Amino acid sequence: MRSSMFRCVSRAHYSTSVTEDFINSILARAQEATAKASSNALKLDKMKEGRMQNKRRNGNQNRNSMNNKESRGREGNQGERNMRLKNRSSDSVRANKQQWNKGANTSFVKNPTGNTVVMQPQFKKMQNGKNNLKGDARVEDDLLDVFNSSMEQKPVNFNGTPKSKARFQKKSHILTASKRRKAPQQQLQKVIKRPVSSEYVLEEPTPLSLLEYTPQVFPTKESRLVNFTLDSLKKSNYPIYRSPNLGILKVHDFTLNTPNFGKYTPGSSLIFAKEPQLQNLLIEEDPEDFHRQVTGEYQLLKPYVKKDFEKLTKSKDTVSKLVQNSQVVRLSLQSVVMGSEEKKLVYDVCSGMKPISELQQ
């Protein structure tokens, strides 16, 4: 039974073996497809190179026209730039449309890396978005190139000759300030000079320590005596600084009046007086001045007591106040260089023993 079953199996009417012709045909088709893809990629590269060259030429022409038309305002330059940007954007849009309108079939494009990419029509929208982004990036790059070239290009005169640089270039103080802030600077430390001070230590005074505060001209007894004699001679109108009259006839025997000599007296004329003879002059000496200036003994004023003021008032408070006032006046007047009579009169008036009208007399 089994042998009869196997014998009934029929063979296929075509050959199931793979022939060499079939393999060669497949290889030929694959080679044709790769050749077409490579040729299309080469064409696209050539088109890109041509576009780049055209862009460079247009850019150079536009730059030259911008440099030649510097006298125009900013508005004209801005309009030209806008027109150029519009043209470039329209060119990029047209190129993108041409790429996708050539055929709805799949195409092979080479990347900048050298790999082939299959372009399929179902992903057309995504690819258009990518191309638009690339076009915007190209426009931005072109703008940067134009700006850099305009900055680097030298200024030109109306004749077309390049302008000479100014000798003194104005620099921005803002940049210099920012550079100074960034640069590390050493802070200048102000040296505060303090005065030399030494602590004062109390010491018991000695004759040697007191010599530091003595004047250069020592007030000795002889010097005080000389000063007293000079004062007494001036008071007695003795000729100290003028020639004395010794009784011999002279032409110039008149001198100025001594009280006004060396003093400015407005509203008064100069008085000439005849110099008296030397033998007729009398030198006046005041013994109180002698004791006061030479020996250092001043006039001692008599102090007042309560009994002296009881004649003026009966209240005890006013009497005690008058006594205290008289003591203050006496101590202050004792060391004053004055005449004895004048000093006594001032003492009585200030103490309240005499009226003020006596000072005017």
From Swiss-Prot:
Stretches with biased composition (Basic and acidic residues): 43-52, 69-91
GO molecular function, one term: structural constituent of ribosome
Compositional bias of kind Low complexity: 59-68
Locations listed in the record: Mitochondrion
Transit peptide: 1-14
UniProt-annotated stretches for the region Disordered: 37-99
Source taxon at top rank: Eukaryota
Gene Ontology CC terms: mitochondrial inner membrane; mitochondrial small ribosomal subunit; mitochondrion
GO BP term (any one): mitochondrial translation
Keywords of this entry: Mitochondrion, Ribonucleoprotein, Ribosomal protein, Transit peptide
Main location (coarse class): mitochondrion
Family: Belongs to the mitochondrion-specific ribosomal protein mS46 family.
Subunit composition and interactions: Component of the mitochondrial small ribosomal subunit (mt-SSU). Mature yeast 74S mitochondrial ribosomes consist of a small (37S) and a large (54S) subunit. The 37S small subunit contains a 15S ribosomal RNA (15S mt-rRNA) and 34 different proteins. The 54S large subunit contains a 21S rRNA (21S mt-rRNA) and 46 different proteins.
Function field: Component of the mitochondrial ribosome (mitoribosome), a dedicated translation machinery responsible for the synthesis of mitochondrial genome-encoded proteins, including at least some of the essential transmembrane subunits of the mitochondrial respiratory chain. The mitoribosomes are attached to the mitochondrial inner membrane and translation products are cotranslationally integrated into the membrane.
Name of the featured protein: Small ribosomal subunit protein mS46
Name of the gene this protein is made from: RSM28
